[in-house]
């Protein structure tokens, strides 16, 4: 199992709990994530877990909670080019949610419960290369809130605890 994190900040607490886990800092955004995954040379036996913080639309997902993304869509593409990536089965016992991958703050959810900046790249690469993709996100904020209101530390700590549970179960 390989754990991908967009930033060192998101990975730090997990590294402290699981120092022997394979952690890769993929970079922020779809391009950086796709390039990082391509450099790993994944095969069908690999499981890549994309981990990080995310924003929630509305009140359906609580700040501080940890979820598994089971459906991901890049909503910034014109509608006729959009593809929804669906997970056939959840990988974890976490609540499954639908997510949008965005590069700019989207105040419209398009039916998603959360947003992030890397997930669609993970699932596109999984389709192309045949590895198992899992996306686990901790909710740090409500979409549209200013950064000073985000609960990054709380979210990163909650994420690390859930990932440790996943690591211990493998």
Q: Positions of the model-derived regions?
A:
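Glycine-rich phosphate- or other oxyanion-binding loops that anchor nucleotides, phosphorylated ligands
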Residues: 2, 7-170
